[in-house]
């Protein structure tokens, strides 16, 4: 891969082996954005120089980012790459230091990077509804600044953790769903406000707004992924009530009929989807939906594997750096205790390697290491029953690092 900022260096070797998807998810080549060049050539071992921005954020964010940083450094050392890391503030800590949830310096660093790894933002300290700004505003703004319109959340059950799920093994075993959540439209970005009424009451409103092009691009992206997976796409809406959902349904139907006729395509109302995720999650392959519906459904689905601490996500646009993060929150109740599960952030780092840097073998190495650690019986506190032994944040990462070279 050629990087206009620093460049690839290629050398002949025999170390490249066939690549397999350890966790069963990947992006289609047609939209896996690798803005700095072209895919690696079979038979070449290529050295990459890349700039990676770390955004630790709040709560347990700094702890899990620190461990993912260790893993990325190990990848660079093991495969001969050169990763340049820089750390910047976002969220509550940024509000405390600058008064803004996303300082200009952070935005500039992210735009100049090849990829971004985020910890978590928010916490009770900044929960004042009357505050000028909130930590979550930093996340919304960075998505907008970078043009990130698609959030990918893989929901994959690990065989080793099936008994950790609140659902029965026979319901969740084999679950492998890839959610595509639209990020730039809908209720979170439409017109909103608070009005004072003559009788002393207040009236609040939030408006869901979508354009044809916003729906088209996310549906196409999801469809390309379906072609690379099990060839099935489900679109979730509320078209029986909402006009914005009716637009989604019309546009999606046209795109699928005209451009992806070989894909098995269906639509499900959001309330039904919430039930289906708990009763028959293995029925779904790729799911595409709007901003708020995706936000809620993916949080629900995140409990299928047994813990939020196991699930990564990626936010991607048409070009430029992607943003990678665990889907769990800042968990301020355990911050600083050294017990946070870093595996979701480590898996997010693997997604970063694959989708922003084009390093498939390296990503698979990280994912395989995590899987071996779980197979060996190592667990963090969120993955065990009360009273059972568990490992801390650093210790579980130590095992991942050992497994990578073992």
Regions found by a protein language model. Name each.
Residues 13-16, 45:
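Cysteine-centered motifs
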Residues 58-61, 114, 180, 222, ...:
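Buried hydrophobic positions in well-ordered alpha/beta secondary-structure cores of metabolic enzymes
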Residues 92-95, 278-378:
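Glycine-rich phosphate/nucleotide-binding loop
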Residues 184-185, 189-229, 233, 239-241, ...:
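Glycine-rich phosphate/pyrophosphate-binding loop and the adjoining helix
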Residues 96-205, 292-294:
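N-terminal glycine-rich phosphate/adenylate-binding segment common to multiple enzyme folds
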Residues 80-103, 277:
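N-terminal beta-loop-helix "entrance" segment that forms/cooperates
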Residues 53-70, 75-76, 199-271:
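Glycine-rich phosphate/diphosphate-binding loop of Rossmann-like nucleotide-binding domains
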